[in-house]
Amino acid sequence: MNKSRKFVSILLTVFFVVAAMPMVTVRAQEFETTAKAYALIEANTRQIIASENGEEKFHAAGLTKLMSYLLFFEALADGKVRSEDSVRVSQEAAKKGGTSVFLDSGTSYSFETLLKPAIMCNANDAVTALAEHVAGSEAAFVELMNARAKELGLSCTFADCTGISSESLVSANDLAVIAAELSKYSGFFKYSTIWLDTFTHESGRETEMSNSNVLIKNDLYDGMSTGSTPSSGYSAAISAKSGGGRFIAIVIGDKDTSSRFKLAEELIGYAIATFGVKQIAQQGGKVKTLPVANGDVEEVGVYAKEDLSILYKKGEEGSISTNIQVDELTAPLQKGQIVGKIVITAPEGEISVALAVDQDVKEQSFGSGWHRLLRGFLGLTEYEEPKTVAP
């Protein structure tokens, strides 16, 4: 029987603040759904737009792998593993149940080669082999999964790297945050968008692979994962880019495969029709050049300490204002020293991100001060040398 569910849209936060994001009620929207829980997030801002039973933990089967994928790409980014690393398939990995590409125990493949079946068709044997390579064993990898969850401020608990274990319990909101973090890695979408492919084994035999996410046939969608068991129901994580943002729908425990995709489409369709995303500042990006008093240089650049993006309701863009607040700069200054902030004001509230100077600025010496005074008197720029006048 269909249950009428309501969600509340939430706006305006900085993406790096997860645990203490400001929440402003904008409107309520009703959906007819049979899912146990769902969540809708904008990945750039880490803003939960919609959620029903979002904090309740469930066994979400294959969606557990979202954390495994995140750790794979973080290990690659940190240089802990390399894409060309040789990964040996253990007996434990080869005998994993559920979806697989039927890897043979004792065979070896590159890390990159196994990423494709792990992501594209949620192959449990490939995921386990990669997890063992990253951490030495699946048990050690699970410890990394739980540690990373705590770092992200999440309450989920993992018992395995694949989601086969019913003791892996996650909430829709937690999965939304994990999926948003994973979406930073373009390498993931390289494989999550493949519909059909073939895996060639070390022996030369081939296994046909297919993606269970039917929505990727539509160019709007680019992944992310699915999962199902008789007891947990049908779950999905679906991603789409639009309007400067990336919207991700998490559906847990729906009654059948078509229902999970229908709800995901409705959630993302609502987000695309209603919201836009605007990036105000990029982490490390220069925001402005400001004068410095009593320094060995006359100006210094200031940069944003974090990314700053806002989620806004379409039609309200004109009501968003940006204000740079910086005190008068006086030397000495240290590179990275916070000297002000960018403040964004919108109808729903106010957010800000710190600004820091991009170089050391020493106090000017008597000589440098006299030289600067002389240059000003002669009308010279910072880089002009005094001209020699012929006798």
Language-model features: where?
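Short alpha-helical segments used as structural interaction elements across diverse proteins
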Residues: 2-3, 62, 257
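Structural motif marking the loop-to-transmembrane transition
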Residues: 4-8, 60, 111, 366, ...
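Active-site-adjacent loops and short helices of periplasmic peptidoglycan-processing enzymes
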Residues: 24-173, 177-186
